[in-house]
């Protein structure tokens, strides 16, 4: 019984960590994309 409880708690902690990592990765990807768009826009303005 104790082992099942510990395993359940551990599983919840691992799952929450994985979900947090996914959201963090998505946020980093969006930040990089926005940075690339800003650089592209600056390059276009410089060419004009």
From Swiss-Prot:
GO terms (BP aspect): response to toxic substance
Membrane topology: Lipid-anchor
Primary role: Plays a role in the bacteriolysis. Is activated under conditions of high osmolarity by the factor sigma S. Entericidin A functions as an antidote.
Keyword terms, alphabetized: Cell membrane, Lipoprotein, Membrane, Palmitate, Signal
Compartment(s): Cell membrane
Family from the record: Belongs to the EcnA/EcnB lipoprotein family.
Signal peptide boundaries: 1-21
Positions where lipid (N-palmitoyl cysteine) attaches: 22
Positions of S-diacylglycerol cysteine lipidation: 22
Any one GO cellular component localisation term in the record: plasma membrane
InterPro entries named among the record's database cross-references: Entericidin (IPR012556)
Gene name tied to this protein: ecnB
Name of the featured protein: Entericidin B
């Amino acid at each position: 019984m104790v082992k099942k409880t510990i395993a359940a708690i551990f599983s919840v902690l691992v799952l929450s960590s994985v979900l947090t990592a996914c959201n963090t990765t998505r946020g980093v990807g969006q930040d990089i994309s926005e940075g690339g768009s800003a650089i592209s826009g600056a390059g276009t303005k410089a060419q004009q």
